[in-house]
Regions:
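Intramolecular chaperone/auto-protease modules of tailspike-like proteins
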Residues: 118-245
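Glycine- and small/polar-enriched repetitive beta-structure motifs of secreted/surface proteins
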Residues: 1-119
């Protein structure tokens, strides 16, 4: 009984019932779920394959958004974007999430820096940050090589479980990366009272399927600024003491 739908491809939208204003292009696109959602757009074999009641989702690429069921407002670009093991994990019931590509993406090129919304008129309950020098001193920068769990086992199997995979070096990348261990940063944040349970995790994120931690590296900048300010105050105080001698 749906209206204003455009469906192109074998098995595309095969189980749709009341969904409206949807566009499904590609074999088995939105083909497995009983679709009641509206205003979804996908192109690619198996894109949005499990979609049910979700709406306003956009998926481009083979198997893009393959796990989405009731999630809404998601944008999934590239092969396997939103599948278990991809950077955002399995996007199923999550809302308003953007995922670019799968775990094989190695480089993103862009001409300019990202501009992130930060208008003070849109913020409330503003208080000074209390994470600074002590937090930074406790961080442990490391170098490492990726050996992704998602490259072990058959991630296309119905019963695939990322948590059951144990890397053994077989699929280790040959290039070095630099950063922090997300779980270690999580522990530091929690010790300071910034917990995910209270929705106060600052730099650490966990995918909606609970299987992969990530870090928001740009959010370390305010903490680093606070640390520099605290260190500058200490230097000024010591300089004043020396001058007074």
């Amino acid at each position: 009984t749906g209206t204003l739908n455009t469906i192109v491809g074998g098995l595309a939208g095969d189980a749709m019932t009341t969904g409206s204003n949807n566009t499904f292009i590609g074999y088995d696109a939105a083909g497995a779920g009983v679709v009641t959602g509206n205003s979804n757009n996908c192109m690619g074999v198996g894109a949005l394959r499990a979609l049910t009641s979700g709406g306003n989702n956009s998926a481009l690429g083979d198997s893009a958004g393959v796990s989405v069921t009731s999630g809404t407002g998601n944008v999934l670009l590239g092969h396997d974007a939103g599948r278990s093991g991809s950077p955002g994990g399995a996007i199923s019931t999550a809302n308003n999430t953007v995922v670019l590509g799968d775990e094989n993406i190695g480089v993103i090129h862009v001409q300019v820096a990202l501009t992130v919304a930060s208008d003070e008129r849109d913020k409330t309950d503003v208080v000074d940050l209390d994470l600074g020098l002590d937090f930074v001193k406790a961080l442990e920068p490391v170098t490492y090589y990726w050996d992704k769990r998602s490259k072990y086992g058959d991630k296309y199997a119905e019963d695939y479980d990322l948590l059951a995979q144990t890397p053994d070096g077989t699929h280790k990348e040959d290039w070095m990366d630099i950063g922090f261990k997300a779980q270690a940063v999580r522990d530091l944040e929690e010790a300071a009272g910034y917990t995910a349970a209270a929705k106060k995790n600052l730099t650490v994120s966990l995918t909606s399927d609970g299987k992969q931690y990530g870090l928001k590296y740009e959010k370390f900048i305010p903490i680093l600024v606070k640390a520099i300010q605290e260190q500058s105050a200490l230097i000024t105080a010591l300089t004043d003491r020396i001058t007074a001698l």
